Amino acid sequence: MKVAVLGAAGGIGQALALLLKTQLPAGSKLSLYDIAPVTPGVAVDLSHIPTAVEVKGFCGEDPTPALEGADVVLISAGVARKPGMDRSDLFNINAGIVRNLIEKVAATCPKALVGIITNPVNTTVAIAAEVLKKAGVYDKNRLFGVTTLDVIRAETFVAEAKGVDVASVKVNVIGGHSGVTILPLLSQIEGVNFSDEEVAALTKRIQNAGTEVVEAKAGGGSATLSMGQAAFRFGMSLIRGLQGEANVVECAYVDGGSEHAVFFAQPVLLGKNGVEKVLPYGEVSAFEANARDAMLDTLKGDIQLGVDFVK
């Protein structure tokens, strides 16, 4: 199994690479790429950790050597949010970065499962899809927007609010990966009940959690460690699916034939072909149905921005 991390010298990439080095199945290969010249050094640093995972680092303009033979590609390259920015402010820089990297993926490892972490995910996934289509290698079952950070935040905040064991909390988060497009389905969580006020407050906190971190870091960055862990969880689920493990389910932002938008985050069953099945997200409350319907214009606009960027 070979996993490539593109953007490996950044805060998310380094956290993700550390977790992968310590947790990937024995015999795996971990390939790190970033434009920054420090990247081979990050690989050397990680190589001193005693696990049976081979690490190599690559830097410069061309990620091709890092991508050769990759089964899974996780892309976190791009600029981070600063205070006062929202995820859409990142579009002008990150759109071009994702386009260029996906062109190389299309040429080098078109069958790889690709997880896009680079924000704004609502738009960058659409960019990736259009680039892959142009190259004639698009497979909607192999492209994912990684929304797992919304899921782990929801799990954490619910457990804190209700004083329950976080391991017992399972939350589906649907829609997209910014602001109002993030919709945790709190009504479905077993064993806990919320007042209307609690639902409204928790939903807003989950939607704005990224800003909470950006402001707390006071200009020093955005969510890197929690995003690294979320990307690791999702990446490992992709690998478990590839290895034939049954019943591997994660929420992800996919081109899954949703009635709501071309790309929509919802639970997916993962397997040897990436998405084996898009799963229904179940019954929702009136609050959730209203929030879902209210987000769709924003989500569709984000997607169209990506389509137009490539055209």
Swiss-Prot record:
GO molecular function list: L-malate dehydrogenase (NAD+) activity
Lineage top rank: taxon: Bacteria
GO biological process: malate metabolic process; tricarboxylic acid cycle
Record has NAD as a keyword: yes
Binding site for substrate: R81, R87, N119, R153
Catalytic residues (UniProt): H177 (proton acceptor)
Keyword list, A-Z: NAD, Oxidoreductase, Tricarboxylic acid cycle
Keyword Zinc: no
Pfam families cross-referenced by the UniProt entry: Ldh_1_C (PF02866), Ldh_1_N (PF00056)
Sequence positions that bind NAD(+): G7, A8, A9, G10, G11, I12, G13, D34, N94, I117, T118, N119, M227
SUPFAM superfamilies xrefs: LDH C-terminal domain-like, NAD(P)-binding Rossmann-fold domains
Class of this enzyme: oxidoreductase
GO cellular component terms listed in the entry, alphabetical order: cytoplasm
Subunit structure: Homodimer.
Name this protein carries in UniProt: Malate dehydrogenase
Source species: Shewanella amazonensis (strain ATCC BAA-1098 / SB2B)
Gene name in the database record: mdh
